[in-house]
């Protein structure tokens, strides 16, 4: 198998994994993310080894497909990253709200603070 065909196969696998819906279960989702990360590493290794220049029409078509799918993969990974950041922020807010309920008088006090009424 040529490196171009190998890259095409890895790109197709990655495209399928990225566009599969993420599982709501945290452990299964983490496993999916690990699989995606592994495919990205394998794909990067194939790209680092070097690719031959496409000479015939079939090779050029494969390269076009790889480029189109790579763009779609990048967009989907950015979307997934945004979702993960949003979930992290929601978790932090939930944690902060729970802390306020657990320790309602833990915040800063206004005792001993000088308020300057002049402006």
Swiss-Prot record:
Claim: Nucleus is one of the keywords in the record: no
Classification lineage: Bacteria, Bacillati, Bacillota, Bacilli, Bacillales
Subcellular locations according to the entry: Cytoplasm, Cytosol
Family: Belongs to the bacillales FliT family.
One of the GO BP terms on file: bacterial-type flagellum organization
GO cellular component, one term: cytosol
Keyword Transcription regulation: no
Chain's role: May act as an export chaperone for the filament capping protein FliD.
Tree of life domain: Bacteria
Protein name as catalogued: Flagellar protein FliT
Assembly behavior: Homodimer.
Organism: Halalkalibacterium halodurans (strain ATCC BAA-125 / DSM 18197 / FERM 7344 / JCM 9153 / C-125)
Assigned keywords, A-Z: Bacterial flagellum biogenesis, Chaperone, Cytoplasm
């Amino acid at each position: 198998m040529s490196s171009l065909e190998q890259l095409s196969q890895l790109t197709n696998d990655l495209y399928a994994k990225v566009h599969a819906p993420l599982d709501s279960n945290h452990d299964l989702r983490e496993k999916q993310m690990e699989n995606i990360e592994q495919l990205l590493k394998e794909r990067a290794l194939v790209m680092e080894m070097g690719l031959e220049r496409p000479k015939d029409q079939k090779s050029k078509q494969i390269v076009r497909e790889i480029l189109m799918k790579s763009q779609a993969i990048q967009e989907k990974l950015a979307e997934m990253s945004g979702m993960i950041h949003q979930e992290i922020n929601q978790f932090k807010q939930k944690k902060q709200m729970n802390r306020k309920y657990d320790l309602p008088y833990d915040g800063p006090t206004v005792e001993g603070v000088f308020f300057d009424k002049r402006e």
